[in-house]
Amino acid sequence: ERAEDSGNESEGDHEELSALVDMGHDALWDVDDL
């Protein structure tokens, strides 16, 4: 993953991105259901 290449500085951001991505996927699934 790119997080490893970027170093430890990206770990915090990566966690936030993961949360946002999870929310995004949920939103996309909701749209697909419609």
Curated annotation (Swiss-Prot):
Modified residues (Phosphoserine): S6, S10
GO biological process: receptor catabolic process; viral release from host cell
GO CC annotation: host cell membrane; membrane
Key words of the record: AIDS, Apoptosis, Host membrane, Host-virus interaction, Ion channel, Ion transport, Membrane, Phosphoprotein, Transmembrane, Transport
UniProt key word Transport: yes
Subcellular location: Host membrane
One term of GO molecular function: monoatomic cation channel activity
Transmembrane segments: none
Keyword Electron transport: no
Coiled-coil region list: none
UniProt feature, compositional bias: Acidic residues: 1-14
Top-level taxon: Viruses
Membrane topology: Single-pass type I membrane protein
Activity modulation notes: Ion channel activity is inhibited by hexamethylene amiloride in vitro.
Domain comment in the entry: The N-terminus and transmembrane domains are required for self-oligomerization and proper virion budding, whereas the cytoplasmic domain is required for CD4 degradation. The cytoplasmic domain is composed of 2 amphipathic alpha helix that form a U-shape.
Subunit record text: Homopentamer. Interacts with host CD4 and BRTC; these interactions induce proteasomal degradation of CD4. Interacts with host BST2; this interaction leads to the degradation of host BST2. Interacts with host FBXW11. Interacts with host AP1M1; this interaction plays a role in the mistrafficking and subsequent degradation of host BST2. Interacts with host RANBP2; this interaction allows Vpu to down-regulate host BLM sumoylation.
Family listed: Belongs to the HIV-1 VPU protein family.
Protein name as catalogued: Protein Vpu
